[in-house]
């Protein structure tokens, strides 16, 4: 039985989610929660090694999905599940919704295969709250171009990101009980006001 809460941050590259992750962590700390901040792919020593491979090496789309879930299984076993059992609040920069969006939407991998992997790797674990930061593709691209050297996903064409974004929004419609879609074109102050209200709701 888990006693902590599991929050995930999602969105296409350039959506601005990482800007607000630390803000939510700080809000929870103010509420006297013990917070574990982590990311996918990654979160463990093995996961971080797989992250480097996944972000920079070309591979078959099924290999990519399998490695994502391999890193996730280790992440759950070593970080997420123990933290929740302790009563901690876990905030993860991406989780399984990202695999459905990027590998399912962007790469066109059969959704049934992803469903099977999800049921194998974490049949009883879902986020309590998923914050989906949504922006138009041109805004996301402009933000990416202004930042840093891009990884292989960030270098994908507009069609890839359109399909990835569409799958994210489909997931949000499928699981409205845990998703909040955040309009990430607004000011940081406006977004943080919304996040403050959402956090208050989940911690009520």
From Swiss-Prot:
UniProt-listed CDD domains: TMPK
Keyword Repeat: no
Pfam families in the record: Thymidylate_kin
Top-level taxon in the UniProt lineage: Bacteria
Single GO BP term: dTDP biosynthetic process
Record function comment: Phosphorylation of dTMP to form dTDP in both de novo and salvage pathways of dTTP synthesis.
Protein name: Thymidylate kinase
Species annotation: Janthinobacterium sp. (strain Marseille)
